[in-house]
Protein backbone atom coordinates (compact mmCIF):
# COMPACT_ATOMS: atom_id res chain seq x y z
CA UNK A 1 0.00 0.00 0.00
CA UNK A 2 1.21 3.52 -0.72
CA UNK A 3 3.32 4.47 2.33
CA UNK A 4 2.75 7.63 4.35
CA UNK A 5 6.26 8.84 3.51
CA UNK A 6 5.44 9.00 -0.20
CA UNK A 7 4.00 12.39 -1.21
CA UNK A 8 1.46 11.42 -3.85
CA UNK A 9 -1.38 13.83 -3.05
CA UNK A 10 -2.47 15.64 -6.18
CA UNK A 11 -1.04 12.92 -8.37
CA UNK A 12 -3.00 11.89 -11.46
CA UNK A 13 -1.61 8.39 -11.07
CA UNK A 14 -1.79 7.29 -7.44
CA UNK A 15 -4.82 7.14 -5.15
CA UNK A 16 -5.39 5.81 -1.64
CA UNK A 17 -5.26 2.04 -1.71
CA UNK A 18 -2.82 1.62 -4.61
CA UNK A 19 -0.11 -0.95 -3.95
CA UNK A 20 3.38 0.17 -4.92
CA UNK A 21 6.92 -1.18 -4.66
CA UNK A 22 9.60 1.26 -3.50
CA UNK A 23 12.77 0.82 -5.53
CA UNK A 24 16.26 2.20 -5.19
CA UNK A 25 16.91 5.91 -5.74
CA UNK A 26 13.37 6.79 -4.71
CA UNK A 27 11.73 5.12 -7.69
CA UNK A 28 8.53 3.17 -7.25
CA UNK A 29 6.41 0.81 -9.32
CA UNK A 30 2.60 0.66 -9.30
CA UNK A 31 1.88 -3.02 -8.64
CA UNK A 32 -1.90 -3.10 -8.14
CA UNK A 33 -4.17 -0.06 -8.54
CA UNK A 34 -7.19 0.56 -6.33
CA UNK A 35 -10.04 0.45 -8.86
CA UNK A 36 -12.81 1.08 -6.34
CA UNK A 37 -14.25 4.35 -5.14
CA UNK A 38 -13.25 3.46 -1.59
CA UNK A 39 -10.31 5.07 0.12
CA UNK A 40 -8.44 2.22 1.80
CA UNK A 41 -5.32 3.78 3.25
CA UNK A 42 -3.90 1.46 5.88
CA UNK A 43 -1.26 1.99 8.54
CA UNK A 44 0.30 -0.71 10.66
CA UNK A 45 -2.31 0.05 13.32
CA UNK A 46 -5.42 -0.45 11.17
CA UNK A 47 -4.19 -2.85 8.50
CA UNK A 48 -6.95 -5.50 8.25
CA UNK A 49 -4.57 -8.26 7.19
CA UNK A 50 -2.35 -7.67 10.24
CA UNK A 51 -5.36 -8.12 12.52
CA UNK A 52 -6.53 -11.18 10.59
CA UNK A 53 -3.03 -12.67 10.64
CA UNK A 54 -2.94 -12.34 14.43
CA UNK A 55 -6.23 -14.28 14.58
CA UNK A 56 -4.82 -17.10 12.45
CA UNK A 57 -1.55 -17.14 14.42
CA UNK A 58 -3.61 -17.49 17.60
CA UNK A 59 -5.22 -20.62 16.17
CA UNK A 60 -1.77 -21.95 15.31
CA UNK A 61 -0.68 -21.42 18.93
CA UNK A 62 -3.65 -23.53 20.02
CA UNK A 63 -2.58 -26.32 17.68
CA UNK A 64 1.01 -26.06 18.93
CA UNK A 65 -0.17 -26.40 22.52
CA UNK A 66 -2.05 -29.62 21.86
CA UNK A 67 0.65 -31.13 19.70
CA UNK A 68 3.15 -30.52 22.50
CA UNK A 69 0.78 -32.51 24.72
CA UNK A 70 0.69 -35.31 22.10
CA UNK A 71 -2.92 -34.82 21.08
CA UNK A 72 -3.96 -35.78 17.55
CA UNK A 73 -5.91 -33.21 15.52
CA UNK A 74 -8.94 -34.81 13.86
CA UNK A 75 -11.71 -33.73 11.48
CA UNK A 76 -15.42 -34.46 11.72
CA UNK A 77 -18.08 -33.97 8.99
CA UNK A 78 -19.64 -30.59 8.25
CA UNK A 79 -22.87 -32.15 6.98
CA UNK A 80 -24.41 -34.38 9.65
CA UNK A 81 -27.60 -36.35 10.28
CA UNK A 82 -27.96 -34.99 13.81
CA UNK A 83 -26.56 -31.51 14.56
CA UNK A 84 -26.96 -31.89 18.34
CA UNK A 85 -30.04 -32.15 20.52
CA UNK A 86 -29.73 -29.18 22.91
CA UNK A 87 -33.31 -27.88 23.18
CA UNK A 88 -32.50 -24.16 23.14
CA UNK A 89 -30.52 -24.22 19.89
CA UNK A 90 -31.95 -23.57 16.42
CA UNK A 91 -30.24 -25.30 13.52
CA UNK A 92 -29.35 -24.84 9.85
CA UNK A 93 -30.60 -27.57 7.50
CA UNK A 94 -29.99 -28.45 3.87
CA UNK A 95 -30.93 -31.24 1.46
CA UNK A 96 -28.91 -33.62 -0.68
CA UNK A 97 -30.67 -34.38 -3.98
CA UNK A 98 -29.55 -37.12 -6.36
CA UNK A 99 -32.22 -37.77 -8.94
CA UNK A 100 -35.32 -38.88 -7.06
CA UNK A 101 -33.34 -39.50 -3.87
CA UNK A 102 -33.53 -36.76 -1.23
CA UNK A 103 -31.79 -36.75 2.12
CA UNK A 104 -31.80 -34.11 4.84
CA UNK A 105 -28.60 -32.93 6.48
CA UNK A 106 -27.67 -30.31 9.06
CA UNK A 107 -24.75 -28.08 9.90
CA UNK A 108 -23.43 -29.14 13.32
CA UNK A 109 -24.02 -27.07 16.45
CA UNK A 110 -21.05 -28.99 17.88
CA UNK A 111 -18.74 -31.77 16.63
CA UNK A 112 -19.21 -33.62 19.93
CA UNK A 113 -21.24 -36.60 18.72
CA UNK A 114 -18.77 -37.51 15.99
CA UNK A 115 -15.73 -36.94 18.19
CA UNK A 116 -17.11 -39.44 20.69
CA UNK A 117 -17.37 -42.01 17.93
CA UNK A 118 -13.58 -41.71 17.63
CA UNK A 119 -13.25 -42.36 21.38
CA UNK A 120 -15.33 -45.51 20.98
CA UNK A 121 -12.99 -46.61 18.18
CA UNK A 122 -9.97 -46.29 20.48
CA UNK A 123 -8.79 -42.66 20.26
CA UNK A 124 -7.25 -41.49 23.54
CA UNK A 125 -6.23 -37.82 23.10
CA UNK A 126 -7.89 -35.88 20.30
CA UNK A 127 -8.82 -32.29 19.48
CA UNK A 128 -10.60 -30.44 16.71
CA UNK A 129 -10.98 -26.78 15.72
CA UNK A 130 -14.28 -26.78 13.86
CA UNK A 131 -16.75 -24.29 12.43
CA UNK A 132 -20.13 -24.72 14.11
CA UNK A 133 -23.49 -23.16 13.32
CA UNK A 134 -26.40 -21.96 15.45
CA UNK A 135 -29.35 -20.34 13.75
CA UNK A 136 -30.99 -17.24 15.20
CA UNK A 137 -27.93 -16.18 17.23
CA UNK A 138 -26.44 -12.74 16.55
CA UNK A 139 -25.30 -10.45 19.38
CA UNK A 140 -22.04 -8.84 20.46
CA UNK A 141 -21.06 -12.21 21.94
CA UNK A 142 -22.89 -14.63 19.63
CA UNK A 143 -22.57 -15.39 15.93
CA UNK A 144 -24.47 -17.86 13.78
CA UNK A 145 -21.11 -19.30 12.67
CA UNK A 146 -18.24 -19.52 15.10
CA UNK A 147 -15.21 -21.67 15.83
CA UNK A 148 -15.27 -24.40 18.44
CA UNK A 149 -12.26 -26.05 20.00
CA UNK A 150 -13.09 -29.43 21.50
CA UNK A 151 -10.66 -31.83 23.09
CA UNK A 152 -11.15 -35.22 24.74
CA UNK A 153 -9.12 -37.55 26.92
CA UNK A 154 -10.00 -41.20 27.40
CA UNK A 155 -9.48 -42.59 30.91
CA UNK A 156 -9.37 -39.06 32.38
CA UNK A 157 -11.52 -37.14 34.82
CA UNK A 158 -12.62 -33.50 34.80
CA UNK A 159 -9.72 -32.30 36.92
CA UNK A 160 -7.36 -33.23 34.07
CA UNK A 161 -9.44 -31.25 31.56
CA UNK A 162 -9.54 -28.31 33.97
CA UNK A 163 -5.75 -28.42 34.26
CA UNK A 164 -5.50 -28.52 30.45
CA UNK A 165 -7.62 -25.39 30.17
CA UNK A 166 -5.65 -23.42 32.75
CA UNK A 167 -2.42 -24.33 30.97
CA UNK A 168 -3.92 -23.45 27.56
CA UNK A 169 -5.10 -20.00 28.68
CA UNK A 170 -1.74 -19.21 30.25
CA UNK A 171 0.18 -20.55 27.23
CA UNK A 172 -1.83 -18.45 24.76
CA UNK A 173 -1.66 -15.35 26.98
CA UNK A 174 2.13 -15.64 27.03
CA UNK A 175 2.28 -16.12 23.25
CA UNK A 176 0.11 -13.03 22.68
CA UNK A 177 2.04 -11.08 25.34
CA UNK A 178 -1.11 -10.22 27.29
CA UNK A 179 -1.93 -10.64 30.97
CA UNK A 180 -2.74 -14.06 32.33
CA UNK A 181 -5.80 -14.46 34.59
CA UNK A 182 -4.94 -12.96 37.96
CA UNK A 183 -6.26 -15.99 39.82
CA UNK A 184 -8.11 -19.26 39.25
CA UNK A 185 -11.29 -19.75 41.31
CA UNK A 186 -13.55 -22.80 41.55
CA UNK A 187 -17.10 -22.92 42.93
CA UNK A 188 -19.89 -25.45 42.90
CA UNK A 189 -23.38 -24.38 41.86
CA UNK A 190 -24.58 -25.06 45.40
CA UNK A 191 -21.85 -22.83 46.88
CA UNK A 192 -22.77 -19.95 44.58
CA UNK A 193 -26.50 -20.14 45.33
CA UNK A 194 -25.73 -20.23 49.06
CA UNK A 195 -23.30 -17.32 48.86
CA UNK A 196 -25.22 -14.94 46.60
CA UNK A 197 -28.85 -16.06 47.01
CA UNK A 198 -28.85 -17.45 50.58
CA UNK A 199 -30.44 -20.59 49.16
CA UNK A 200 -29.62 -24.25 49.80
CA UNK A 201 -29.49 -25.77 46.32
CA UNK A 202 -29.60 -29.57 46.04
CA UNK A 203 -29.95 -32.01 43.15
CA UNK A 204 -33.59 -32.38 44.22
CA UNK A 205 -34.41 -28.65 44.11
CA UNK A 206 -37.75 -28.25 42.29
CA UNK A 207 -39.06 -25.81 39.71
CA UNK A 208 -41.49 -24.31 42.25
CA UNK A 209 -38.65 -23.72 44.72
CA UNK A 210 -36.65 -21.86 42.07
CA UNK A 211 -39.72 -19.86 41.08
CA UNK A 212 -40.24 -18.83 44.72
CA UNK A 213 -36.56 -17.92 45.00
CA UNK A 214 -36.77 -15.77 41.86
CA UNK A 215 -39.76 -13.89 43.28
CA UNK A 216 -37.93 -13.39 46.58
CA UNK A 217 -34.89 -11.99 44.73
CA UNK A 218 -37.02 -9.84 42.38
CA UNK A 219 -35.71 -11.66 39.31
CA UNK A 220 -37.94 -11.22 36.26
CA UNK A 221 -38.96 -14.76 35.27
CA UNK A 222 -42.05 -13.99 33.18
CA UNK A 223 -40.36 -15.62 30.17
CA UNK A 224 -39.57 -18.84 32.09
CA UNK A 225 -41.37 -22.02 31.07
CA UNK A 226 -39.03 -24.73 32.38
CA UNK A 227 -36.87 -25.42 35.42
CA UNK A 228 -33.81 -24.67 33.26
CA UNK A 229 -35.21 -21.21 32.52
CA UNK A 230 -35.67 -20.39 36.21
CA UNK A 231 -32.18 -21.64 36.99
CA UNK A 232 -30.45 -19.60 34.30
CA UNK A 233 -32.43 -16.40 34.88
CA UNK A 234 -31.45 -16.43 38.55
CA UNK A 235 -27.87 -17.46 37.76
CA UNK A 236 -27.34 -14.76 35.14
CA UNK A 237 -28.83 -11.91 37.18
CA UNK A 238 -27.63 -12.71 40.69
CA UNK A 239 -24.50 -14.82 40.33
CA UNK A 240 -22.70 -14.65 36.98
CA UNK A 241 -21.55 -11.02 37.35
CA UNK A 242 -20.32 -11.34 40.94
CA UNK A 243 -16.73 -12.46 40.45
CA UNK A 244 -13.95 -10.11 39.25
CA UNK A 245 -13.44 -10.27 35.46
CA UNK A 246 -9.67 -10.80 35.74
CA UNK A 247 -10.20 -14.17 37.46
CA UNK A 248 -10.58 -17.42 35.56
CA UNK A 249 -13.62 -18.98 37.22
CA UNK A 250 -14.78 -22.60 37.08
CA UNK A 251 -18.35 -23.44 38.10
CA UNK A 252 -18.94 -27.15 38.64
CA UNK A 253 -21.50 -29.71 39.86
CA UNK A 254 -24.69 -28.76 38.00
CA UNK A 255 -28.24 -29.97 38.75
CA UNK A 256 -29.13 -33.29 37.08
CA UNK A 257 -31.55 -31.75 34.56
CA UNK A 258 -28.56 -29.83 33.16
CA UNK A 259 -26.25 -32.81 32.98
CA UNK A 260 -26.61 -32.88 29.16
CA UNK A 261 -23.99 -35.39 27.97
CA UNK A 262 -22.33 -35.68 31.40
CA UNK A 263 -22.67 -38.50 33.89
CA UNK A 264 -24.06 -37.93 37.39
CA UNK A 265 -21.77 -38.20 40.41
CA UNK A 266 -22.64 -40.24 43.50
CA UNK A 267 -24.47 -37.26 45.05
CA UNK A 268 -26.67 -36.76 41.99
CA UNK A 269 -24.94 -33.70 40.54
CA UNK A 270 -24.12 -33.41 36.85
CA UNK A 271 -20.36 -33.95 36.65
CA UNK A 272 -19.49 -30.98 34.47
CA UNK A 273 -18.11 -27.46 34.68
CA UNK A 274 -18.36 -24.14 32.88
CA UNK A 275 -15.48 -21.66 32.65
CA UNK A 276 -15.68 -17.85 32.72
CA UNK A 277 -13.12 -15.10 32.24
CA UNK A 278 -13.26 -11.38 31.55
CA UNK A 279 -17.06 -11.35 31.64
CA UNK A 280 -17.43 -14.17 29.10
CA UNK A 281 -18.57 -17.75 29.33
CA UNK A 282 -15.76 -19.59 27.55
CA UNK A 283 -16.26 -23.32 27.84
CA UNK A 284 -18.36 -26.31 28.91
CA UNK A 285 -16.73 -29.52 30.08
CA UNK A 286 -18.16 -32.95 30.86
CA UNK A 287 -17.22 -36.20 32.53
CA UNK A 288 -18.75 -37.95 29.57
CA UNK A 289 -21.80 -40.17 29.83
CA UNK A 290 -21.08 -43.50 28.13
CA UNK A 291 -24.23 -45.45 28.98
CA UNK A 292 -26.15 -45.75 25.68
CA UNK A 293 -29.57 -46.27 27.27
CA UNK A 294 -29.34 -43.26 29.59
CA UNK A 295 -27.92 -41.18 26.74
CA UNK A 296 -30.76 -42.18 24.42
CA UNK A 297 -33.34 -41.29 27.07
CA UNK A 298 -31.75 -37.86 27.63
CA UNK A 299 -31.47 -37.17 23.91
CA UNK A 300 -35.09 -38.12 23.32
CA UNK A 301 -36.13 -35.88 26.21
CA UNK A 302 -34.22 -33.02 24.54
CA UNK A 303 -36.06 -33.64 21.27
CA UNK A 304 -39.40 -33.65 23.10
CA UNK A 305 -38.50 -30.28 24.64
CA UNK A 306 -37.59 -28.96 21.18
CA UNK A 307 -40.99 -30.00 19.88
CA UNK A 308 -42.76 -28.34 22.81
CA UNK A 309 -40.82 -25.13 22.10
CA UNK A 310 -41.90 -25.18 18.46
CA UNK A 311 -38.39 -25.74 17.12
CA UNK A 312 -37.48 -27.82 14.08
CA UNK A 313 -37.81 -31.54 14.72
CA UNK A 314 -34.65 -33.57 14.13
CA UNK A 315 -33.76 -37.23 14.43
CA UNK A 316 -31.11 -39.01 16.44
CA UNK A 317 -27.81 -40.26 15.04
CA UNK A 318 -28.16 -44.02 15.48
CA UNK A 319 -24.50 -44.61 14.68
CA UNK A 320 -23.63 -42.62 17.83
CA UNK A 321 -25.65 -44.97 20.03
CA UNK A 322 -24.16 -47.97 18.25
CA UNK A 323 -20.71 -46.61 19.10
CA UNK A 324 -21.68 -46.17 22.76
CA UNK A 325 -23.13 -49.69 22.85
CA UNK A 326 -19.88 -51.09 21.48
CA UNK A 327 -18.07 -49.45 24.38
CA UNK A 328 -16.77 -45.90 24.83
CA UNK A 329 -14.16 -45.80 27.61
CA UNK A 330 -14.52 -43.45 30.60
CA UNK A 331 -13.63 -40.06 29.13
CA UNK A 332 -13.76 -36.33 29.74
CA UNK A 333 -13.98 -33.52 27.21
CA UNK A 334 -14.58 -29.83 26.75
CA UNK A 335 -15.99 -27.41 24.18
CA UNK A 336 -14.41 -23.94 24.08
CA UNK A 337 -15.40 -21.05 21.81
CA UNK A 338 -12.12 -19.74 20.49
CA UNK A 339 -13.56 -16.38 19.42
CA UNK A 340 -14.72 -15.94 23.02
CA UNK A 341 -11.27 -16.81 24.38
CA UNK A 342 -9.63 -14.41 21.91
CA UNK A 343 -12.07 -11.68 23.00
CA UNK A 344 -11.16 -12.31 26.64
CA UNK A 345 -7.42 -12.30 25.91
CA UNK A 346 -7.47 -9.14 23.77
CA UNK A 347 -10.30 -7.34 25.60
CA UNK A 348 -12.46 -7.28 22.44
CA UNK A 349 -16.10 -6.38 23.08
CA UNK A 350 -17.76 -7.43 19.81
CA UNK A 351 -17.33 -10.77 18.06
CA UNK A 352 -17.79 -9.03 14.69
CA UNK A 353 -14.31 -7.56 15.12
CA UNK A 354 -13.06 -11.13 14.65
CA UNK A 355 -15.69 -12.68 12.37
CA UNK A 356 -16.04 -9.85 9.82
Predicted features along the sequence, with ranges:
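Short, glycine/acidic-rich hinge or "gate" loops at secondary-structure transitions
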Residues: 75-78, 176-186
Amino acid sequence: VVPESLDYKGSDILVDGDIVAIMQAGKFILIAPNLTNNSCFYTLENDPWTNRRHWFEYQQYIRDFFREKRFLEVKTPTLVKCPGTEPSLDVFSTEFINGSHKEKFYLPTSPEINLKKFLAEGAERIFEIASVFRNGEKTERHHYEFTMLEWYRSYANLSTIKHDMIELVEYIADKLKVARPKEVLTFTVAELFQKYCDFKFTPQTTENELKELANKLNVDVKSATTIDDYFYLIFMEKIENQWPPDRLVFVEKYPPYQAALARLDQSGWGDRFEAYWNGLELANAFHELNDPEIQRARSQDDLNKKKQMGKEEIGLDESFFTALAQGMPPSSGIALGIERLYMALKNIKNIDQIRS
